[in-house]
């Protein structure tokens, strides 16, 4: 079968390989991927900055954002059936008894990222208990479930932490970044009734800006210093340390900032001491969140259905580029105007 692979730690080793078709073990299923989404993590792996091949393999099959059909059941599987359309979660625990999305590094593997082959192939295998069934009416956009699950968990964590202190009911939110995570954060928070302001670098006539406004949110294409006022909740989705610190300035007393970006090492942060002192004196909370479990995938699908009802084809317009396996290199190229690129693998019969 064909699979999109890299040799981890070797920059620009991306290639399409012919590899053996996998077989499901006990508790596993064989999947026939329909499509996979591509994100910044894939870019880092291709650049040799991250990633690990499974034991005994020189290469790693990419693809952690997947929509697939159940093709074959291994022994002991009774929660899904052949023909079900599903999305798989990403992480699998090793020697960790915590919810898998809270396991520390070294105690888990991740499909298409770390120690476990992904789904950018004609077939893949995964553990059945980490599959979430997709309703027929959401199949066209369900490839977005994985990034949406990250948003769902991040917002859930922020609300849980904020509400553990007193009855905290955020009314306003600042979203930093308008990539898939920033836009999906805006969508979820608008569905929850919050007033949102989304800040990014694209011009006000860009697709990203229009998508924000179509949700009823405010879009700002300038520096954070031009924004007045404070916000109960801040979602940081840029991966810029300076933007994160500047966002803290706009966090209201008793507010919560959730970090969904991944930050580069080093660098000098302007006025960090004053910003942190202000955070202490005003009981501001800063919390990081990564990955997601089954419950947040399920919540994401429920919000997808609600978004379709309220915002029409909004979700489908996040997919700005599609490519096939035979043209896989096009899928793994990036421009500033791309939002979500999808690799089409198998047709849905």
Swiss-Prot record:
UniProt GO MF annotations: D-glucose binding; glucose 1-dehydrogenase (NAD+) activity; glucose 1-dehydrogenase (NADP+) activity; NAD+ binding; NADP+ binding; zinc ion binding
Chain residues that bind Zn(2+): 39, 64-65, 146
Designated name of the protein: Glucose 1-dehydrogenase 1
PANTHER family: GLUCOSE 1-DEHYDROGENASE, ZINC-TYPE ALCOHOL DEHYDROGENASE-LIKE PROTEIN C1198.01-RELATED
Lineage: Archaea, Thermoproteota, Thermoprotei, Thermoproteales, Thermoproteaceae
Source organism per UniProt: Caldivirga maquilingensis (strain ATCC 700844 / DSM 13496 / JCM 10307 / IC-167)
Binding site for substrate: 41, 110, 146, 291
One GO-annotated biological process of the protein: non-phosphorylated glucose catabolic process
The family this protein is said to belong to: Belongs to the zinc-containing alcohol dehydrogenase family. Glucose 1-dehydrogenase subfamily.
Keyword ATP-binding: no
Primary enzyme class: oxidoreductase
Task performed by this protein: Catalyzes the NAD(P)(+)-dependent oxidation of D-glucose to D-gluconate via gluconolactone. Can utilize both NAD(+) and NADP(+) as electron acceptor. Is involved in the degradation of glucose through a non-phosphorylative variant of the Entner-Doudoroff pathway.
């Amino acid at each position: 079968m064909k699979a999109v692979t890299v040799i981890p730690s070797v920059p620009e080793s991306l290639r399409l390989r012919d590899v053996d078709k996998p077989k499901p073990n006990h508790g596993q299923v064989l999947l026939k991927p329909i499509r996979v989404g591509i994100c910044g993590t894939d870019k880092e792996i291709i650049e040799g900055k991250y990633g690990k091949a499974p034991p005994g393999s020189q290469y790693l099959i990419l693809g952690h954002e997947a929509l697939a059909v159940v093709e074959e059941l291994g022994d002991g599987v009774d929660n899904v059936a052949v023909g079900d359309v599903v999305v798989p979660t990403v992480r699998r625990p090793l020697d960790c008894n915590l919810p898998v999305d809270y396991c520390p590094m070294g105690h888990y593997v991740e499909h298409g990222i770390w120690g476990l082959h992904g789904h950018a192939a004609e077939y893949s295998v995964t553990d059945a208990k980490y599959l979430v069934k997709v309703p027929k009416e959401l199949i066209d956009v369900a490839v977005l479930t994985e990034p949406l699950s990250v948003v769902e968990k991040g917002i859930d964590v922020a609300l849980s932490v904020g509400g553990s202190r007193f009855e905290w009911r955020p009314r306003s939110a600042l979203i930093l970044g308008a990539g898939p995570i920033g836009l999906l954060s805006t969508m979820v928070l608008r569905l929850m009734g919050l007033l949102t302001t989304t800040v990014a670098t694209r011009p006000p006539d860009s697709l990203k800006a229009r998508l924000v406004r179509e949700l009823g949110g405010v879009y700002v294409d300038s520096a954070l210093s031009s924004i007045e006022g404070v916000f109960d909740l801040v979602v940081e989705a840029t991966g810029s340390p300076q933007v994160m610190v500047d966002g803290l300035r706009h966090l209201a007393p008793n507010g919560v900032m959730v970090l969904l970006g991944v930050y580069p090492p080093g660098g000098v942060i302007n006025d960090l001491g004053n910003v942190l002192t202000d955070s202490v004196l005003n009981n501001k909370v800063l919390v990081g969140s990564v990955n997601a479990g089954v419950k947040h995938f399920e919540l994401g699908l429920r919000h997808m259905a609600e978004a379709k009802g309220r915002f029409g084809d909004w979700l489908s317009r996040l997919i700005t580029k599609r490519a096939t396996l035979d043209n896989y290199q096009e899928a793994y190229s990036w421009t500033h105007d791309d939002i979500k690129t999808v690799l089409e693998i198998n047709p849905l019969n």
